[in-house]
């Protein structure tokens, strides 16, 4: 038998199945992301990029909150690393005035969300949250990646 096991089996981090379905959560996330875009577009460009960077750090912090609720040390350590990594990327992107790098950060966060959606992330999360976050992240990333922000 292989010594390599899936994260889900090793951590016992099943999704919790209360809440809206995947499609509803994706749509809700996209609507929230578009609402955020509307606010960001109303700001001067420098402030808009700062807000988009702070948003990426905040979105990463949500998973740390799930890790606190989860209570396992391993989840706390991994999610703290995730928060530090995405925050560092956001700071770098804002300092370099690089909306493209910030957009890449938001899309990279989609990967983190997908791991949790497929129950491969290290932390127990509500089943609907990764889908909501994916919809939001993509909606926020697109204007950054297309040069509209």
Model feature map: region roles:
Residues 1-149:
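Short amphipathic, positively biased membrane-proximal segments
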């Amino acid at each position: 038998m292989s010594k390599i096991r899936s994260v889900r089996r090793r951590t016992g981090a099943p999704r919790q199945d209360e809440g809206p379905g995947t499609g509803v959560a994706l749509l809700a996330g996209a609507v929230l992301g578009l609402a955020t875009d509307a606010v960001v577009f109303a700001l001067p460009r420098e402030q808009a990029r700062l807000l988009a960077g702070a948003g990426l750090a905040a979105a990463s912090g949500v998973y740390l909150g799930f890790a606190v609720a989860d209570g396992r040390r391993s989840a706390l350590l991994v999610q703290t690393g995730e928060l530090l990594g995405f925050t560092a990327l956001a700071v770098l992107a804002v300092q370099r005035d690089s909306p493209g790098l910030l957009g890449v950060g938001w899309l990279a966060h989609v990967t983190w969300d997908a791991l949790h959606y497929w129950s491969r992330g290290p932390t127990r999360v509500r089943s609907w949250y990764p889908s909501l976050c994916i919809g939001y992240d993509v909606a926020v990333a697109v204007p950054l990646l297309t040069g509209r922000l």
